[in-house]
From Swiss-Prot:
Annotated function: ATP-binding RNA helicase involved in 40S ribosomal subunit biogenesis and is required for the normal formation of 18S rRNAs through pre-rRNA processing at A0, A1 and A2 sites. Required for vegetative growth.
GO annotation terms (biological process): rRNA processing
Taxonomic classification: Eukaryota, Fungi, Dikarya, Ascomycota, Pezizomycotina
Record has ATP-binding as a keyword: yes
The protein, known as: ATP-dependent RNA helicase DBP8
Source species: Gibberella zeae (strain ATCC MYA-4620 / CBS 123657 / FGSC 9075 / NRRL 31084 / PH-1)
Biased composition (Acidic residues): 56-70
Basic and acidic residues bias locations: 43-55
Pfam family, one: Helicase_C
Domain notes for this protein: The Q motif is unique to and characteristic of the DEAD box family of RNA helicases and controls ATP binding and hydrolysis.
EC number of this enzyme: 3.6.4.13
Binding of ATP, residues: 160-167
Amino acid sequence: MTPSIGSDHANSASDEEILSGAASSSDESDYLDSGVSRKRRRTAEISQDKAGKVEPEDDDDDDDDDDDDEELKRVLSTIAAPSRIKRNVPGDKKEVQAKPVVAPKNTIQAPTDPNTTFSALDVRPWLVQSLENMAIKRPTGIQKGCIPEILKGRDCIGGSRTGSGKTMAFAVPILQKWSEDPTAIFAVVLTPTRELALQIFEQFKAISSPQSLKAILVTGGSDMRTQAIEIGKRPHVIIATPGRLADHIRTSGEDTICGLRRVRYVVLDEADRLLNATGPGSMLPDVEECLSVLPPATERQTLLFTATITPEVRALKDMPIKPGKQPVFVCEVDTQTLAIPATLKQMYIKVPVTHKEHYLHTFLLTEANVDKTVILFCNRTSTADYLHHLLRMLEHRVTSLHSKLPQRQRIDNLARFRASAARILVATDVAARGLDIPEVSLVINYDLPRDPDDYIHRVGRTARAGRKGEAVSFVGQRDVELALTIEKRVGRDMEAWEEEGVNLETRVVRDALKLVSEKKREALLEVEEGREVGGKRKRTKQKLRVD
């Protein structure tokens, strides 16, 4: 039986401290937030209990320790919290079942023969050799299903788990068709993050090494004039983020963008993110701007790939067939079962929000984790920056990746992590999609994401291509509702984290409490003074004075 979140050691004194200190951290980790005092809030809860109505706590806890322990136990036992906080009742535990998804009529089932080769999919010998040079010898399920149909000229919607080889599922047929008619501009690939665009760019260059493919990268953080010149030279493939390509369409002039009007292939990688029309940071307006100058749908092939099938993507399956076009084909591999790899082990650790950093430092140094390559996800850039400072002061080999970093530093930091110069990457969700770093064996959710689909993409950075991996989520008392939502989405419960011979709470008190508290103050001071990691003051551009 899997222990329930928030109730594993309910009678221990350490757990009382955890529960009394836990607060909402679903979208932030700011332990400086102040709320209504615990004493007043408990008094209100007791009066509600007497009236027969008890509501969950809504405010963060502070450090008031005047209340009696027995009163605390009684109040906590009456809180109308989700079932995962309550004690386990024999026979009351139910398995979380993923809802079956009915596949559309035009869905193609990928071949299941494990002996299928790329040659059997009509892939040209030079491409097969390039794939073998990259240690890719047999196609994955999504590649088996998509490559033959794309070569036939059909539009595609491909859905498959993270780490299943979706990039090669569209890169291989595009390069094969390009080699038969190497015109420019042959393909445009749109993707939501700069790092993913860079990775796709590198994969296109690697697989096309026997040929003279000219591919360019068009992303934010780089000089627009240089990019405009490169676009004007008519490369064969453009890999871009929609925001920067839309900027060129609006400002770079017809001479620069006229080549886009003859594109043969348009790829929307991570289509669920690109087509999301809700919430801040929607990329849909920029995507529409990009599509406005590309050939109409009847004159190009459109390929959509995603790990999470959203309503926006699903709606495209039922669009009417345009005259002169073959029906859109849909290839979904394993999307009707679990949304995460079977080789991924999901776990959680109960932590008080006031001591998350202490638990993190201690957890990273346990015998099982001290040598692992780790991606640590946060919800905010400020949290990622702060943790980068803190973990470096605690002598961890760490780097960071988030949107507030200059593009050059983002590239350098990711390169350090790939080269194992840093074993920990502190990142926001810019690193959650598409990045393929085989050495990553552990993903930590320092903050639980609000959207369960973001959780799927985060934990998908490990356990890729059949390898094993672990994902550990830090769960505060008020994160339980969110954790349950995530479990329902992925179709599997999280297990309580355990390591033989390790009591995390004891180690926190014994080894980390004083040390981490001191380093927290130093890290916060560095961040407040605007210093770089390591203590140097950040350089700022200064205007030249003309005397």
